[in-house]
Amino acid sequence: MDLKNKSAVILLSGGLDSSTVTGLAKASKAKIFGLSFDYGQRHKKELDSAFTIANHFEIEEFKIVKLDLSLWGGSSLTDIKKDLPIDGIQQNTIPNTYVPGRNTIFISVALSYAEAINADLIGLGVNALDYSGYPDCRPDYIKKFQELANLANKRGREENPIKLWTPLLDLNKEDIIQLAFDNNVPLEKTWSCYSGNLEPCGKCDSCRIRQTAYKKWQIKKNEN
């Protein structure tokens, strides 16, 4: 998608995927408006990373929205009484790191923000191939939310809809790492770990996915 002269609200968590989407948008000369959420998560390191990435790419604006989902919990990311899973990724199950309704809430806020500033796109780092089992990172979810977005606001009703831009949706994680390198993403400044320690734990699902992807990326790189 050609993003030159377009404006994009990007959900920027500070992780690998959203930072790569930001890098792609910057390389495409889009005007970028970053949006992060302080939603009662276990730690704020990802917000620090999001701020760092926003500064790195010199985006137009960066906002952090306070929205406390820990009020009702339901996830090990918002309820410290729940243990983070460290036994490896279980296939065909939704892990307890899933935050009920998180992407639906975040994208809805982004849609409001995008319409208010007359943005063209909402950039999302969702990835269907190497996702952690979350229901709101899948192609059918994105398709249906786009249909909802087209009906839910003035722009959509006037046949000038705000598009959900998901450039990573069908990519392997190792290909996303390559995209990150190709688009000047400072990977060392991104944060994927579910824990808020000084260093990534190396045990949670997010760390495992990233570690496995990096090993596969290294193998591909050595083969070329």
From Swiss-Prot:
Q: Name one GO biological process term.
A: queuosine biosynthetic process
State the pathway, as annotated in the record: Purine metabolism; 7-cyano-7-deazaguanine biosynthesis
Q: What catalytic activity is recorded? A: 7-carboxy-7-deazaguanine + NH4(+) + ATP = 7-cyano-7-deazaguanine + ADP + phosphate + H2O + H(+)
Extract one GO molecular function annotation from the record.
ATP binding
Q: Respond yes or no to whether keyword NAD is given for this record.
A: no
Judging by the UniProt lineage, the source's domain of life is: Bacteria
Q: Which cofactor does it need?
A: Zn(2+)
Cofactor binding, note field: Binds 1 zinc ion per subunit.
Could you say which EC number(s) this protein's record lists? 6.3.4.20
Q: Which Pfam families match?
A: QueC
Task: Tell me if ATP-binding is a UniProt keyword of this record.
Answer: yes
Q: Which UniProt keywords are listed?
A: ATP-binding, Ligase, Metal-binding, Nucleotide-binding, Queuosine biosynthesis, Zinc
Which residues hold Zn(2+)? C193, C201, C204, C207
Q: What class of enzyme is it?
A: ligase
Q: Which residues bind ATP?
A: L12, S13, G14, G15, L16, D17, S18, S19, T20, V21, T22
Question: What role does this protein play?
Answer: Catalyzes the ATP-dependent conversion of 7-carboxy-7-deazaguanine (CDG) to 7-cyano-7-deazaguanine (preQ(0)).
Q: Which family does it belong to?
A: Belongs to the QueC family.
Query: What's the protein here called?
Result: 7-cyano-7-deazaguanine synthase
Name the source organism: Prochlorococcus marinus subsp. pastoris (strain CCMP1986 / NIES-2087 / MED4)
Annotated gene: queC
